[in-house]
Amino acid sequence: MGKRKANHIISGMNAASAQGQGTGYNEEFANEPLTPAERQNNKKRKKNQ
């Protein structure tokens, strides 16, 4: 099998800039409102980073 290109990298852009901070697991849903449960989890995770 050939090497698969990472999905979150937008072709045509600088590869390095596409992989910086902020390209997290939930990047596609970044502008959706969080549920109260998710907000709690977010706070916990922030502390651990």
Swiss-Prot record:
Keyword Thylakoid tagged: no
Compartments (UniProt record): Spore core
One Pfam family, short name: SspO
Protein's UniProt keywords contain Magnesium: no
GO biological process per UniProt: asexual sporulation; sporulation resulting in formation of a cellular spore
Stimuli inducing this protein: Expressed only in the forespore compartment of sporulating cells.
Entry keywords, A to Z: Sporulation
Chief location bin: other
Stretches for region Disordered: 1-49
Domain of life: Bacteria
Annotated GO CC locations: endospore-forming forespore
Family the UniProt entry places it in: Belongs to the SspO family.
Protein name: Small, acid-soluble spore protein O
Organism, scientific name: Bacillus mycoides (strain KBAB4)
